[in-house]
């Protein structure tokens, strides 16, 4: 058991609501969008997911950190969130494989964590008022509240930043299984808008060689790589900001190359086809979201992490809706008519979450197989 010295900490929302707790991570202050996640497990995967970049994540489940941290379960190279808000954490690690506590993990990554917060009250407030920005401090609670509100206001004026450029790879990276023969893999180019490691692992397990490219990579270069398929990854932020990505996708749609979009990639694909995007009141963040597959009429339980949704009323005639949320009827999946192109709003790789949507990766590979066969 680790001995963690608890200092007083504070969360202030932009409407002035204050929550007092104890510091369990790094010392400092930060400002970010406060969202809540309803997952019971998978806290490590959540806070290392680049889709949460620049956000403050509040966990609704009361006990976080019970099994500690296993570094191999990270979804990126580091913690991506601005801060973590929770009710209670545990520094007694119950998994024999894990040697690092949740609190120590936050501290080593210089991330603020606050425990002792009434996360149910916080969640109800966000559900009622909508997502708010907040200020967190682990440097004590004796601060000037007027000054903090002013800082939040200044931050809000700059909130539409290009977050993708801050999380994308800076160079091309190749991922593949060792000892795989050249003619026995599918050549997939993945746009890194903030990709999770689990997406790469799932595609590799299906026989893919992944060429991960920066988010700003020109479509002409991607086509020159002679891909069998193109993946548009998950990532953070408002999709309408990423004009460069939308233009590249529009060019790629002029080819016959199969395209699969996930989360942010799903939204970008829709925008590239003329659709509009809506900012959700408090988003979908959790691993228990029921989604209806309109093609099979079955319900799948999915992992979700998004604050924007496609406006169904703006879809062009070449788009078919394939999935909808059973919580609020928001659009969850689309495919294009007469093109090997489709996308899904949730996370088929889960991590954390159920595996109900893994079949979408196989659907993508089936399109890739057909394309590869016909282009020879």
From Swiss-Prot:
SMART domains: CPSase_sm_chain
Recorded metabolic or biological pathway in which this protein acts: Amino-acid biosynthesis; L-arginine biosynthesis; carbamoyl phosphate from bicarbonate: step 1/1; Pyrimidine metabolism; UMP biosynthesis via de novo pathway; (S)-dihydroorotate from bicarbonate: step 1/3
EC annotation from Swiss-Prot or TrEMBL: 6.3.5.5
Annotated binding of L-glutamine, by residue: 51, 235, 237, 264, 267, 305, 308
GO MF term list: ATP binding; carbamoyl-phosphate synthase (glutamine-hydrolyzing) activity; glutaminase activity
Keywords: Amino-acid biosynthesis, Arginine biosynthesis, ATP-binding, Glutamine amidotransferase, Ligase, Nucleotide-binding, Pyrimidine biosynthesis
Pfam families per record: CPSase_sm_chain, GATase
Segments for region (CPSase): 1-183
Record InterPro entries: Anth_synth/Amidotransfase (IPR050472), CarbamoylP_synth_ssu (IPR006274), CarbamoylP_synth_ssu_N (IPR002474), CarbP_synth_ssu_N_sf (IPR036480), Class_I_gatase-like (IPR029062), CPSase_GATase1 (IPR035686), GATASE (IPR017926)
Active site: 263 (nucleophile), 347, 349
Catalysed reaction, written as an equation: hydrogencarbonate + L-glutamine + 2 ATP + H2O = carbamoyl phosphate + L-glutamate + 2 ADP + phosphate + 2 H(+)
Superkingdom of origin: Bacteria
Boundaries of every Glutamine amidotransferase type-1 domain copy: 187-374
Description of how the protein assembles with itself and partners: Composed of two chains; the small (or glutamine) chain promotes the hydrolysis of glutamine to ammonia, which is used by the large (or ammonia) chain to synthesize carbamoyl phosphate. Tetramer of heterodimers (alpha,beta)4.
The family this protein is said to belong to: Belongs to the CarA family.
Protein name: Carbamoyl phosphate synthase small chain
Species of origin: Wigglesworthia glossinidia brevipalpis
Lineage: Bacteria, Pseudomonadati, Pseudomonadota, Gammaproteobacteria, Enterobacterales
Gene that this sequence comes from: carA
